[in-house]
UniProtKB/Swiss-Prot annotation:
A motif (YPX[LI] motif 2) lies at residues 660-663. Activated by C-terminal proteolytic cleavage by signaling protease (probably palB/RIM13) at neutral to alkaline ambient pH. Two consecutive proteolytic steps are required for pacC activation. The primary step is pH dependent, mediated by the putative calpain protease palB, to yield a 53-kDa form, pacC53. PacC53 is a transient intermediate, committed to proteolysis by the proteasome, generating a 27-kDa form of pacC. The truncated form pacC27, containing the DNA-binding region, is required for correct regulation of acid- and alkaline-expressed genes in response to alkaline pH. pH-responsive transcription factor required for epithelial invasion and pathogenicity in leukopenic mice. Modulates expression of genes encoding secreted enzymes, as well as cell wall and gliotoxin biosynthetic activities, during invasive aspergillosis. Plays a role in zinc homeostasis and represses the expression of the zinc-uptake transporters zrfA, zrfB and zrfC under zinc-limiting conditions in a pH-dependent manner. Binds to the pH response DNA consensus sequence 5'-GCCARG-3' or PR site in target genes promoters. This is pH-response transcription factor pacC/RIM101. The gene is pacC. Disruption phenotype: Leads to defect in both contact-mediated epithelial entry and protease expression, and significantly attenuated for pathogenicity in leukopenic mice. Results in hypersensitivity to cell wall active drugs such as caspofungin. The keyword Transmembrane helix does not apply. Belongs to the pacC/RIM101 family. InterPro entries: pacC/RIM101, Znf_C2H2_sf, Znf_C2H2_type. The keyword Glycoprotein does not apply. A zinc finger (C2H2-type) spans 80-105, 116-140, 146-168. PANTHER family: PH-RESPONSE TRANSCRIPTION FACTOR PACC/RIM101 (PTHR47257), PH-RESPONSE TRANSCRIPTION FACTOR PACC_RIM101 (PTHR47257:SF1).
Amino acid sequence: MSEHQDTATNNNTTASPSATAAPMPAPISQEQPSSQPAATTPAPVSTSTPPASVTATAAAATAAVSAPQANGTPPSDEQLSCLWQGCSEKCPSAEALYDHICERHVGRKSTNNLNLTCQWGSCRTTTVKRDHITSHIRVHVPLKPHKCEFCGKAFKRPQDLKKHVKTHADDSVLVRSPEPGARNPDMMFHGAGKGYAAAAHYFEPSLNAVPSQGYAHGAPQYYSSHPPHQPSNPSYGNVYYALNHGHDGHASYESKKRGYDALNEFFGDLKRRQFDLHSYAAVGQRLLGLQNLSLPILTGGPLPEYQPMPAPVAVGGGYGPGGHGAPVYHLPPMSNIRTKNDLINIDQFLQQMQDTIYENDDHVAAAGVAQPGAHYVHGGMSYRTTHSPPTQLPPSHAVATTSASTSMSNPATHSPPTGTPALTPPSSAQSYTSARSPISISSAHRVSPPHHDGGSGMYPRLPSTTMADSLAGGYPTASSAAPPSTLSGIFDDDRRRYTGGTLQRARPEERRPSIQMDTSHDGKEDGERTPTGKARSSGSDSPVRISANLIDPALHSSSPSDAEAALRTAQAATEVADRADSQWVEKVRLLEYLRSYIASRLERGEYDSDSDDHASAAASPVIKHDGHMDGVESSHKPITAEETSAPPAAKAESNHGVMYPTLHGLDGDEDTKMHH
């Protein structure tokens, strides 16, 4: 009886699984005929759910198998065959295959077995360098060592990776990324090591967007932000929405960064003397590149090196730095004006450019300051052109020769009072004795003529001191005495030599006999004898004519159309001159802004003092050596601690007691002579 009960119990326990599992496929079998009538799969197999540990193990195994394949390395049991012509060697990995091809089949020039033609399969690509053929071989070998930091995709060649990275980049990434080769994006953003995947990097675009991945919080180069904060929910990163005015701030940063870089490059060209500082055309062309940019210094005040950026809004439980103020971005320091010496040199170069702009021949001549062709500079100006003296003398020069006070108060040639005159008079004009040389005569006196007792008509008298005496003596005004430091006045007016390249008016023709004064009828009154202006104009067909063969055809106007054409030409020339003047003013203002910026940095001490200290320390021995003007070679030896601690008197005694006492005595005599 008990055995029967045990058997029944065992039967019930064995039947219980089927009994419990049997009702489950019933609803499935009712739904399947409508969509899959031929499905006869047993229910327990299709509805079984594996445990979580089994799923994790399978995923890990799949990742372990797929990772080597992504990098181009096959499993250990798989061999890679070399398909080079005439080679059947097998390599365990793609890297080994690549090394085999480079060393065995390509070879090297040093070993005299260099092969620049690819013989992989049917490929017959030929290159000119070994680097090119080795780069081409990567196409055939499944080696992908270059991995994308954003999506994890691997590539065979670095240029392929570079093209792929551009697909991830947007405008904000291109602006924020530093110079090429400085740092890769993974080093700039330090959030990859905080538990997020390498593909979770998110670059905030210029427009409003919601990222699908976590935001790797970090600060790129020249950006400052608050310390990262781990969110409460570990499955989500910090997600930021850009505000509506973020695009405007982004564009402002772009323009300022562009102008900042252009200004730094301009300072670098100045340091390296890339263009001629004394050429007006070269200076103007170089400044034109800066005028079209929005330089930060043109806004007034010192150059700002940081600007606030719009604060992002944090969502999803992340950390929002907006509550502590907007973060700021820092412009990189200018590498070409880091030290004090750089600032001083740049200021000197800018001054040379300023002198070149101010001394431009065209603008100085247009302003009436100097005319090309003559050796004269207006006395009222504080500068003169070095390459183009004026053509004609202004009225002030003629007046300067009439009186002593006017002529001596107007420094026409800018000559020193006790030095050699700027323009020495010719020997034929005036003759000086040793007592009456231009240097010995005081500037307060004038040259007085010598008094002769006998009236010798062979030599003319020198001009007298006053205007009345000179007129009474029969000498013209132009031949009056000039100051001893200036050119004599005998070459003025019409007797002065004409310079070439100038347009001169033709001499008018002789008067016609019909308009000459009639003196035959003496009995008539004056009104009848002398023709009036009206009669003279009516009697003549045309006014005083100038011979046509002496006039430039371009200056001859005989019809209204020619007059209109001349008027249009004059207007166009005026517009060109006005435009040139405005450009000249812009160049002058830009140079003034640049010099004020350099001066402000020098005043505030905004430069790297460490490099200046090193430079001065390195240059001090040379300066000290140049300062000793002894005239004999001196041997330099390192200074020991004993010599440093010794008093100056003991050093002097030791120096005088050694070597050359006689030479030191000579040096002392020379110093005494120099002081006297």
